[in-house]
């Protein structure tokens, strides 16, 4: 189970342009700060050590800490990060700040030669909870070529990567439509995936709990399962049923100001281990 997370304060957070279909409404900065502080408190209550990276002016999306790197560990090289190549230039400017944060704390940096391909970190690259593989989404933000280069790098460490084609622009990252609950179970929105990707998911989990489109648009899949709890921005009927069956207690934290920018609880942090 992860023990630490990294977050970025929302000092400069705003909806400045439209990078996804959710980005239509201005943000209330004061309310966003309050919601962010409550999320930090919830993560701490769940037993996680909360670490912070300094926000940078004019990097309004830096608060979404899941995207700038992929974090992993390997018995031979120890903890490592793979820097992202973000599809939007404004978000690419965030990446060096995160890479520096990890490098100064002893993480090995595995820089890929992406050559015009895209790879969006922990938004599209999700560890299976037992670390047996990485689930990798592509098609909206990360490109298929970017995932192939990532998979090649992981193969050198005997880490399998399973690619999943995303087909709905509202579910632009994998973490918006797939949420691992434990090593055997996950919730997902089937409509976000190609038919082949749905088959891959069915073969990789003992129990898959589907949710409907309305629930998925409310970010039901963008929660965090940790320490017997599921931290989420809202509790929907399908989600509540799945959590009950997996013996997870819901912990609801309102992050609606951040959802105006297309990200919820999971998007706002990255695990450090």
Question: How should these model regions be labeled?
Answer:
Residues 1-273:
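The feature marks the mature, well-folded catalytic cores of soluble enzymes
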């Amino acid at each position: 189970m992860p023990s630490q997370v990294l977050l970025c304060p929302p000092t400069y957070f705003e909806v400045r342009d439209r990078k996804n279909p959710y980005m239509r409404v201005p943000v209330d900065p004061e309310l966003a700060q309050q919601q962010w502080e409550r999320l930090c408190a919830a993560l701490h209550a769940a037993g996680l050590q909360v670490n912070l990276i300094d926000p940078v002016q004019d990097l309004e999306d830096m608060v979404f800490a899941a995207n700038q790197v992929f974090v992993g560990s390997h018995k031979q090289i120890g903890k490592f990060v793979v820097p992202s190549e973000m599809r939007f230039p404004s978000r690419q400017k965030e990446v060096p700040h995160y890479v520096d944060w990890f490098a100064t704390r002893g993480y090995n940096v595995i820089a890929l030669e992406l050559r015009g391909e895209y790879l969006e970190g922990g938004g599209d690259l999700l560890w299976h909870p037992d670390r047996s593989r990485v689930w990798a989404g592509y098609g909206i933000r990360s490109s298929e070529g970017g995932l192939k280069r990532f998979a090649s790098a992981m193969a050198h460490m005997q880490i399998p990567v399973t690619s999943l084609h995303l087909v709905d622009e509202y579910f632009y990252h994998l973490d918006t439509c797939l949420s691992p609950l434990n090593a055997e179970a996950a919730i997902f929105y089937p409509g976000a995936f190609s038919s082949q990707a749905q088959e891959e998911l069915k073969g990789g989990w003992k129990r898959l709990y589907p949710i409907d489109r309305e629930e998925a648009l409310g970010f039901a899949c963008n929660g965090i399962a940790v320490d017997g709890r599921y931290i989420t921005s809202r509790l929907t009927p399908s989600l509540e049923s799945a959590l009950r069956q997996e013996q997870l207690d819901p912990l609801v934290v309102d992050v609606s100001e951040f959802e105006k920018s297309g990200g919820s609880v999971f998007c706002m942090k990255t695990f450090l281990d």
